[in-house]
């Protein structure tokens, strides 16, 4: 298969084809089975996180080092020239990309990754999250996890639960799965946190089936994947938050009618939307999902920085 990802900016999921997504998933599986310690030998990757991150930053840096690459960068913008001296993001990107073979960036501003790609002098930019916009590498690890647990990416029933309005992970994953055949979505959220209209309109245009469901219990018996998200407390007053939160807590009891193959995923961190009693069920897969972030990011970096593998 031709590697069309070589030297490509990874900014958003809609810009990746089904074939490219499958190539990343396939490569992640190979690397998980057979580690490749030299694929980034003599490569330098800039890891620049302008806002806090634990799993994404550490899994990227682990991925780089396990492939034999070197990491430069920062985990907070507070001590950079950008913050201390008023340097523009464009200037910062131009300088840092001159030092590195790839530029991994998380930024609170929507569109920051695309801006970076315009000033990177051809150095590939990988979006590690830009505000509430896109988080493509989370989607890649989600796709790999779904494939690992289900053996396919076609013909799946997938539910998203919780904050579907602001949750960039569910937006990106919906757009990715929409590239495959026979997908049916269940969107389970309070009206104030419903899936954005533009996502539903995209699905309508593609003729993809989806249902707006009020209760998890109504959907669970049909599901292959149950993707939980955190309802963000800061968006509600106390009484409203307490009501909404209680309606979207998953317990082991909820999973009793589930299919044997159902897996529960979560981008983490969880607060209390998944009871700890779920952890001991065969359906829980969110910790393995987080671990898969390393393999998915290894695959992406290897493909972006190597014309052939």
From Swiss-Prot:
UniProt key word Disulfide bond: no
Pfam family, one: OTCace_N
Binding residues annotated for L-aspartate, in chain numbering: 85, 168, 230
Catalytic activity: carbamoyl phosphate + L-aspartate = N-carbamoyl-L-aspartate + phosphate + H(+)
Highest taxon of the lineage: Bacteria
UniProt-listed GO biological process terms: 'de novo' pyrimidine nucleobase biosynthetic process; 'de novo' UMP biosynthetic process; amino acid metabolic process
Keyword set, alphabetical order: Pyrimidine biosynthesis, Transferase
Cellular-component GO terms for this entry: cytosol
A single MF term (Gene Ontology): amino acid binding
Pathway: Pyrimidine metabolism; UMP biosynthesis via de novo pathway; (S)-dihydroorotate from bicarbonate: step 2/3
PROSITE patterns on file: CARBAMOYLTRANSFERASE
Sites where the protein binds carbamoyl phosphate: 55-56, 106, 135, 138, 268-269
Enzyme Commission identifier(s): 2.1.3.2
Family: Belongs to the aspartate/ornithine carbamoyltransferase superfamily. ATCase family.
Quaternary structure (record): Heterododecamer (2C3:3R2) of six catalytic PyrB chains organized as two trimers (C3), and six regulatory PyrI chains organized as three dimers (R2).
Role: Catalyzes the condensation of carbamoyl phosphate and aspartate to form carbamoyl aspartate and inorganic phosphate, the committed step in the de novo pyrimidine nucleotide biosynthesis pathway.
Protein name, per record: Aspartate carbamoyltransferase catalytic subunit
């Amino acid at each position: 298969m031709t590697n069309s990802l070589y030297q490509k900016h990874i900014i958003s999921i809609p810009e990746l084809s089904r074939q490219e997504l499958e190539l990343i998933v396939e490569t992640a599986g190979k690397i998980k089975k057979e580690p490749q310690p030299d694929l980034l030998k003599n490569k330098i990757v800039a890891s620049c996180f302008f806002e806090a991150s634990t799993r994404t930053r550490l899994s990227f840096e682990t991925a780089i080092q396990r492939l034999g690459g070197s990491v430069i960068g920062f985990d907070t913008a507070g001590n950079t020239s950008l913050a201390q001296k008023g340097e523009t993001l464009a200037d910062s990107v131009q300088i840092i990309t001159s030092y590195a073979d790839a530029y991994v960036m998380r930024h609170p501003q929507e569109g920051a990754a695309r801006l970076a790609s315009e000033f990177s002098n051809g150095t590939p930019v990988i979006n590690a999250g830009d505000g509430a916009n896109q988080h493509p590498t989370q989607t890649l690890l989600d796709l790999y996890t779904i494939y690992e647990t289900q053996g396919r990416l076609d013909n799946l029933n997938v539910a998203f639960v919780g904050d579907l309005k602001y949750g960039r992970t569910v937006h990106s994953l919906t757009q990715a799965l929409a590239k495959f055949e026979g997908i049916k979505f269940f969107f389970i959220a309070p009206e104030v946190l419903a899936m954005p209209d533009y996502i539903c309109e995209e699905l309508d245009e593609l003729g993809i089936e989806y249902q707006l469901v009020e209760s998890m219990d109504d959907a669970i018996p049909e599901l292959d994947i149950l993707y939980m998200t955190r309802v963000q407390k800061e968006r509600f007053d106390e009484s409203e938050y307490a009501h909404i939160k209680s309606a979207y807590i998953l317990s082991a009891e909820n999973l009793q009618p589930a299919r044997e193959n159902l897996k529960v995923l979560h981008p983490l961190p969880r607060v209390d939307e998944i009871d700890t009693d779920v952890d001991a069920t065969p359906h829980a897969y969110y910790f393995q999902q987080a671990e898969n972030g390393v393999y998915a990011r290894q695959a992406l970096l290897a493909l972006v920085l190597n014309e052939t593998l």
